[in-house]
Regions:
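Short hydrophobic/aromatic patch on the recognition helix
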Residues: 45-55
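Amphipathic alpha-helical segments used for helix-helix packing
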Residues: 100-126
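Basic, helix-initiating cap at the start of DNA-binding domains
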Residues: 1-30, 34-46, 60
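Amphipathic alpha-helical packing segments from all-alpha helical-bundle domains
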Residues: 74-80, 87-90, 120-145, 153-156, ...
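C-terminal peripheral helix-coil segments that are non-catalytic and often amphipathic
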Residues: 1-6, 98, 130-149, 171-192
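Alpha-helical DNA-contacting segments of helix-turn-helix folds
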Residues: 55, 62-69, 76
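Hydrophobic alpha-helical connector segments
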Residues: 64, 77-104, 155-158
Length: 192
């Protein structure tokens, strides 16, 4: 897979931006494998040659989509106001409530993409795995700074809580998510 410009937002041409924006909208709304390249090209208003200049294959586009979602998430966490480790954890998980609140939530884009790419050795799954490791490590570092006696275990539980909340918001009712975030944090962080 070609990784040209995949993580450098400044290097993104207008055509590439339209392709990524169109793919993001369609992949999220309809599913990755349900959307063909021809439709993405048509809706982005680019020539087929332009698509292939930026993405040698659809899998390259999917990888760029996953990497961009990862980059945006990391930037959002980095932009959170610096506060105590416990409040940072609450703010990070609180982003779940903010993400699902506007409506139109169709589940976590990473979990959705993973479901469509079952081969754990595929570049898409490796990118998702790197995202999950980063998320776990951020939580683990904050938990260690907060004095958690088993920060890796608690971080794994918080990742599982996050995954569950993202899917509950899609499958059940997003209005319950803020309460579940608060309750989950109270129960998991009370361990010390």
């Amino acid at each position: 897979m070609d990784r040209k410009n995949s993580q450098n937002p400044a290097a993104v041409t207008p055509a590439r931006r339209r392709l990524l924006d169109t793919a993001t909208r369609l992949f999220y709304a309809e599913g990755i494998h349900a959307v063909g390249i021809d439709r993405i090209i048509a809706e982005a208003g680019v020539a087929k040659a332009t698509f292939y200049n930026h993405f040698p294959s659809k899998d390259d586009l999917v990888l760029a989509y996953v990497e961009e979602q990862d980059r945006l998430g990391r930037e959002a966490v980095a932009a959170l106001p610096k506060q105590s480790p416990r409040k940072m954890i609450a703010a990070i998980l609180g982003r779940i409530s903010a993400a699902v609140a506007p409506g139109g939530w169709r589940g976590c884009p990473f979990l959705n993409a993973a479901a469509e790419y079952p081969d754990q050795n595929s570049p898409v799954r490796r990118a998702i795995g790197a995202r999950r490791k980063w998320y776990h490590d951020v939580l683990k570092q904050l938990l260690a700074a907060d004095g958690d006696p088993t920060p890796s275990v608690t971080a794994s539980l918080l990742v599982a809580l996050s995954d569950g909340l993202l899917e509950i918001a899609y499958l059940d009712d997003a209005k319950d998510v803020p309460t579940l975030v608060r309750e989950g944090l109270e129960r998991l962080l009370v361990r010390r």
